[in-house]
Amino acid sequence: MKIPVTLNGNKIILDAHSDESLMRVLHKNGCPSVKSGCSSGFCGACTILLDDKPVASCKVPAGIVRNCDIVTLDYFSKTEEYTTIMSGFQKAGIKLCGYCTAGKVFSAYHILKMPKMPTRQEITDYVKALSPCCTDLETLVNGIIYAIQISNRRQKRG
């Protein structure tokens, strides 16, 4: 099946079976940041932005992404938003293991884009299902709050 998508800013055609996982298809198409982990959507290793929302690509059948915009961590890591998130994580003392980075970064990105400042509890509720393999929940929440503060300061200057 031929599936037109925009992958990391480039219009391409994915060649895949409709029920094949998007994670597998992206990995075959040279996206090394899309990792295979738990295959149940929990670990965050395969997280991508699908139409600007974080999703576990291991749970998405390739057949439903026709004409969608897909962003992987490889591409996103070159953005100002990524720099902001990583600055917040660094301030909180977070050292990501590399395995779950996409899940944590894209979850933070989603929270940063919320129209109103979420409460600490709302942030906690949003990220508590992520794999805690390298970062405890409280530290992750602190890192996201720091990233929000950094983003707000940049917007006031800009």
Predicted ranges, named:
Residues 1-158:
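Signature of N-terminal electron-transfer/Fe-S-associated modules in redox systems
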